[in-house]
C-alpha cells in the first residue's frame, strides 16, 4: 500500500513497504524540468543535476562515489522536460546512509568554480555526443519544429552558448526559484522501516521556501506542423514524424497508449510488421507517446539507407492511412490491452519501478491507483475510444524531421 505524508514545510514523503525484499529505492523528485527554463537558462536544470554530484561541504565528488561503491549501492539522476529525479538503490540496512548522502547532495552542494568549469566540459561532450548520433539529433530537431517558440522545443542539455553563462550564482538563483518544499516529493519503496521514514522527515521536513520561489506555469503551447531537413554524410537517413496528441492528465490516456501499441509500440505492431518484416526497409521502426501536463505528441521514428528513405516514408504513410480509413481490429485491441497489463504488472516487481511510479504520480497527479485499478482502467479501453483518437490525432498535419544524405 502506498502512503503519503506531508511534512510541515510541504515536502511530501511517499512510501510503499515491500517487506519481502532486501533493498530500498529512494528518489528525490523535483517539479523542475527544462520546459520551465527561460531561453537564457536553457540547460541549467540538467547542469544542476550534474553539479549535485560534484561535492558538498563535507563530501568530495569522489567520496560520494566511493560511499555508494563501498555498500554495493547505485546512485544516479535524470532530467526531463518537466521534472528532475535524484535516486539511489541500496540494501535495506544501508537505507539511512543512502538518504543522508542524497540529502547532503541536495542541500549542501558547494558548486565550486573549478568543478563548474570541469562539468561544463563534460556536459558539452554530452551535447556533442547527442549531436553526433543522428537518431538522437533527429528527435531533438523534431521538438524544435513542434514548439519553435516554447521551452518545450529546446534541448534538455542546453547549448554551448547557454552553458558558458552558468555560474554558482545563477545555479543558486534557479534552485531558489524551483527547489521549494511544495515542489518536492521524496519517494521510497522496498523494505522500509518507520525509523527510515522519520529519518527522511528529519532531513527534508524543515527547510524553508525561498522568498524568490516561483510557481511553475504551464504555457499550453501551440503545436506547429512543418519540416526540418539536415544534410549529413551518414549511411542511413533518419526520419521522425509527430502528431499533436493528448496530455498526461487526459482521461483518454490509456486509449492513447493502446493506440500507440497497435501502430508501432511493439514487434507485432502495424509499422514493425509492414516496414520491417514484410518489406525489409528498416532495422529500427517504432512509435511512442510523449505526454506532458498540458500537451502531448505521437511520434514515429524509422531509419533506413539513404536510397530507401522515400519508400520507407511512403510505407509509413500508407500504413497510417489504412489505420485512419479502416480503424483497428478486435484482435489488435485485445492483444494491446493484454500486453499493456502484462508489462505494467511485470514492471512493478522491482523497487526502482515502484519508487518511480509513486514519485511521478504524486508529483504530477497527487494521487495513487492500485494495480487492480490500473488493470480495470485498461480493460475499459474500447474500439470506439481508440478509433475516436485515431480521428483526432492521425488526421492532423504532422511535424517532420529528417537527417541523412541527399535528403530534401
Predicted segments, located by residue:
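M16/MPP (pitrilysin/insulinase) zinc-metallopeptidase core fold and M16-derived inactive scaffolds
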Residues: 20, 25-89, 265-281
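Short alpha-helix boundary/capping segments
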Residues: 36-43, 250-259, 263, 267, ...
Amino acid at each position: 500500500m502506498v502512503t503519503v505524508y506531508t511534512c510541515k514545510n510541504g515536502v511530501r514523503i511517499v512510501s510503499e513497504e515491500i517487506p519481502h525484499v532486501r533493498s530500498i529505492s529512494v528518489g528525490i523528485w523535483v517539479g523542475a524540468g527544462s520546459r520551465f527554463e527561460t531561453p537564457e537558462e536553457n540547460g541549467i536544470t540538467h547542469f544542476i543535476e550534474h553539479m549535485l554530484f560534484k561535492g558538498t561541504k563535507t563530501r568530495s565528488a569522489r567520496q560520494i562515489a566511493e560511499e555508494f561503491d563501498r555498500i554495493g549501492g547505485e546512485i544516479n539522476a535524470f532530467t526531463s522536460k518537466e521534472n528532475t529525479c535524484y535516486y539511489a538503490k541500496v540494501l535495506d540496512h544501508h537505507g539511512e546512509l543512502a538518504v543522508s548522502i542524497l540529502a547532503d547532495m541536495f542541500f549542501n552542494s558547494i558548486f565550486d568554480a573549478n568543478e563548474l568549469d570541469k562539468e561544463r566540459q563534460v556536459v558539452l561532450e554530452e551535447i556533442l555526443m547527442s549531436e553526433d548520433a543522428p537518431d538522437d539529433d533527429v528527435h531533438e530537431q523534431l521538438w524544435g519544429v513542434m514548439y519553435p517558440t516554447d521551452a518545450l522545443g529546446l534541448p534538455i542539455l542546453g547549448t554551448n552558448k547557454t552553458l558558458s553563462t552558468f555560474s554558482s550564482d545563477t545555479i543558486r538563483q534557479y534552485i531558489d526559484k524551483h527547489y521549494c518544499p511544495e515542489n518536492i516529493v521524496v519517494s521510497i519503496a522496498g523494505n522500509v522501516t518507520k525509523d527510515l521514514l522519520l529519518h527522511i522527515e528529519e532531513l527534508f521536513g524543515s527547510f524553508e521556501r525561498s522568498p524568490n520561489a516561483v510557481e511553475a506555469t504551464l504555457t499550453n503551447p501551440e503545436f506547429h506542423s512543418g519540416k526540418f531537413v539536415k544534410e549529413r554524410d551518414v549511411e542511413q537517413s533518419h526520419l521522425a514524424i509527430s502528431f499533436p496528441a493528448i496530455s498526461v492528465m487526459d482521461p483518454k490516456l490509456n486509449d492513447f497508449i493502446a493506440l500507440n501499441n497497435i501502430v508501432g509500440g511493439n514487434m507485432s505492431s502495424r509499422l514493425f510488421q509492414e516496414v520491417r518484416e514484410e518489406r525489409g526497409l528498416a532495422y529500427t521502426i517504432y512509435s511512442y507517446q510523449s505526454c506532458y501536463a498540458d500537451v502531448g505528441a505521437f511520434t514515429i521514428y524509422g531509419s533506413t539507407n539513404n536510397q530507401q528513405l522515400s519508400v520507407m516514408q511512403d510505407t509509413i504513410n500508407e500504413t497510417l492511412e489504412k489505420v485512419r480509413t479502416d480503424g483497428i481490429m478486435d484482435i489488435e485491441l485485445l492483444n494491446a490491452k493484454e500486453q499493456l497489463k502484462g508489462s505494467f504488472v511485470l514492471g512493478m516487481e522491482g523497487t526502482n519501478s515502484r519508487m518511480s511510479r509513486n514519485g511521478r504520480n504524486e508529483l504530477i497527479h497527487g494521487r495513487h491507483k492500485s494495480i487492480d485499478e490500473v488493470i480495470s482502467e485498461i480493460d475499459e479501453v474500447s474500439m470506439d475510444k481508440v478509433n475516436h483518437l485515431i480521428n483526432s490525432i492521425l488526421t492532423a498535419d504532422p511535424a517532420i524531421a529528417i537527417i541523412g544524405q541527399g535528403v530534401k
